Regions:
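Acetyl-CoA-dependent GNAT
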Residues: 5-107, 116-118, 122, 173-174, ...
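Short amphipathic helical patch at the helix-1/turn junction of helix-turn-helix
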Residues: 102, 136-137
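Conserved GNAT acetyl-CoA-binding A-motif
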Residues: 123-134
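Conserved catalytic-core motifs of GNAT/GCN5-like acyltransferases
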Residues: 132-136, 147, 152-168
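Helix-turn-helix
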Residues: 142
Length: 190
């Protein structure tokens, strides 16, 4: 696999340029089956730039949120959203992955695994000891993906937005020398 470079967008960044929003919308629109499961867009088969801009603004309105844009050979292949802390549970010490989408035309190429490894390495290097995420119970493919990466179920509860049943998974983050290979020498940050 070619090198993956990850750019980040934080709440402090200015509005995203139109061309970048169009690229991000392409990733979102290519994940129709996922959006049919989530119901996050009114028509999962017709996701538009203003809808994605609003979704990203909503994600970035949460303190400590970051949008990660993964590129391979200049092409946007995946988008992820992370949170430094759970927005409704101040006692939870772990950061969270709120979203990881791989472009539909680039699935099964290792990009999701590489981006997940990059996110884990980023938080590990920041001194965090665990990483969590929630998967809709109806998304069995995502549940299998995350469990294959070493995430284990730790809770079951409704999500914050719509009350949909979710499995909460957690992965222990290895020390700075352990687990570095999984982060992928191909994943870097610009």
């Amino acid at each position: 696999m070619a090198a993956m470079y990850v750019d980040i967008v934080t709440p402090d960044d200015a509005a995203l340029p139109g061309a970048l929003l169009t690229e991000i919308t392409g990733v979102y629109a290519s994940a129709q089956a996922f959006h049919e499961l989530t119901g996050d867009f009114p028509d999962a088969g017709d996701i538009r730039v203003p809808q994605v801009a609003a979704a990203l603004a909503d994600e970035l309105s949460v303190p400590g949120s970051v949008v990660h844009l993964a590129r391979v050979r200049g092409d946007l292949v995946a988008v992820a959203v992370t949170l430094d802390h759970h927005p409704a549970d101040p006692d939870d010490p772990d950061p969270w992955i709120g979203l990881l989408l791989v472009h539909g035309e680039r699935r099964r190429e290792g990009h999701g695994r590489a981006l997940a490894g990059h996110l884990a390495a980023r938080f590990r290097e920041a001194g965090r000891t665990g990483l969590r995420l929630a998967v809709l119970d109806t998304n069995t493919t995502a549940l299998a993906f995350w469990q294959a990466l070493g995430y284990v179920p730790v809770d079951h509860r409704p999500d914050l937005r719509r009350g949909r049943e979710c499995t909460v998974l957690r992965r222990e983050l290895a020390g700075p020398r352990e687990g570095r290979a999984e982060a992928g020498a191909a994943a870097g940050e610009n």
